[in-house]
Design a protein with these regions (language model features):
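Multi-pass membrane proteins that catalyze or facilitate reactions on polyprenyl-/lipid-phosphate substrates
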Residues: 1-292
C-alpha cells in the first residue's frame, strides 16, 4: 500500500465510519474503483481503532462516568441502581452477539462476505430498513392527522432485551455494506428510541467491539507481518481519527433536527449503481481482491 492510498483510505474511513452508509463498503469500493488491492479486513479493523479513539475523546465525560460508576458498583450495592452502572452492563451485554458471531464467522468475513454483489445488496436492503425506521420515528415526533405525537424512549428506558437487540444489529455490520451505525440506529428507532438515544448507545456499544477487533487483528498481523504495511496503516489510522472526530461532532448535531433520508437515498442509489457496473462487466464483483 502506498502513502497516497493510505491517505485516501484514511479519509474514507473517517468520513464514513459514523454515518449510516458503511465504512467497510466504502473502503472496499474505493479500492475497487481506483484499481487498488482490497485493503482487507485487517486494515479496516486497525483503522477503526483511530475512529474509535475519536469516540473515546468526544464522549470522554460520559465514558469516564459510566466506567467509574460501573466499577464502583461491583463493590457497592447501593450504586447498582444508578443509570451509569446499568449502562456499563448494557454495553457489555450488547457486545456479546458481535463477539460470538465475529469469531464463528471470521473466515467468511474476510472471504466470501467481501463480494461486491453482497455489498450492493446490503447497501440497498439496509437503506430500506433505515428509511422505514426513520419514517416511523418522524411520525411519532410530528404526529399528524388522527395521530398524536408519541413520546419516544430515552437511554434511561433501555433494558437488557433492548441491549441484546442492539447487539444483534451491530453484529450484522460484520457484512460489508450493512453499516454498524446504520444497523444499530435503525434497530433503536424501530424499538421506539429517540434518534439521539439510538445514536449515542450505538457509539458507546461500538467501543469494546472495535477495540477488541483491532487488537485481534494486530495480534494476527504481528504473528504474520507480511500481511500489512504498518507505516501506511498507522498513517491512515491517524487521519481517520481526526476526520472521524469532526464527523461525530457534525452527526450528533445533524440527527437532532434532520431526517436520515439523504443517507437512505444515497445507499440505495449506490447499491443500484454497483449492480449496474457489475452487470455490465465494468466492475468485477471481486475487483481489488488479491490476485484479481
Amino acid at each position: 500500500m502506498s502513502w497516497f492510498e493510505s491517505l485516501i483510505l484514511g479519509l474514507v474511513q473517517g468520513l464514513t465510519e459514523f454515518l449510516p452508509i458503511s465504512s467497510s463498503a466504502h473502503l472496499r469500493l474505493t479500492a475497487a474503483f481506483a484499481g487498488w488491492h482490497d485493503p482487507g479486513a485487517a486494515f479496516t479493523a486497525i483503522t477503526q481503532i483511530g475512529t474509535e479513539a475519536a469516540v473515546l475523546i468526544y464522549f470522554r465525560k460520559d465514558i469516564a462516568r459510566i466506567v467509574s460508576t460501573w466499577f464502583r458498583s461491583l463493590f457497592n450495592k447501593g450504586l447498582r441502581s444508578e443509570q451509569d452502572a446499568k449502562m456499563g452492563w448494557l454495553v457489555i451485554v450488547g457486545s456479546i452477539p458481535i463477539g460470538v458471531l465475529g469469531l464463528v464467522f471470521k473466515d467468511a468475513i474476510v472471504g466470501p462476505a467481501r463480494d461486491l454483489r453482497l455489498t450492493a445488496t446490503t447497501l440497498i436492503l439496509m437503506g430500506i430498513v433505515l428509511g422505514v425506521a426513520d419514517r416511523l420515528a418522524a411520525r411519532d415526533e410530528e404526529g399528524g392527522r388522527h395521530r398524536a405525537i408519541r413520546e419516544r424512549k430515552t437511554l434511561q428506558q433501555l433494558g437488557v432485551k433492548d441491549g441484546l437487540i442492539f447487539g444483534v444489529c451491530q453484529a450484522m455490520a460484520l457484512i460489508p455494506g450493512v453499516s454498524r451505525s446504520g444497523a444499530t440506529i435503525s434497530g433503536g428507532l424501530l424499538l421506539g428510541f429517540t434518534r439521539e438515544a439510538a445514536a449515542r448507545y450505538s457509539f458507546l456499544l461500538a467501543i469494546p467491539a472495535v477495540l477488541a477487533s483491532g487488537a485481534f487483528e494486530i495480534k494476527d498481523v504481528v504473528e504474520n507481518p507480511g500481511h500489512i504495511s504498518w507505516g501506511p496503516t498507522i498513517f491512515a489510522t491517524v487521519i481517520a481519527f481526526f476526520v472521524g472526530y469532526a464527523v461525530i461532532a457534525w452527526f450528533m448535531k445533524f440527527i437532532s433536527t434532520k431526517s436520515f433520508m439523504p443517507f437512505v437515498i444515497y445507499r440505495i442509489l449506490l447499491g443500484i449503481l454497483l449492480f449496474v457496473l457489475i452487470g455490465t462487466d465494468v466492475l468485477s464483483p471481486h475487483a481489488g481482491e488479491s490476485g484479481s
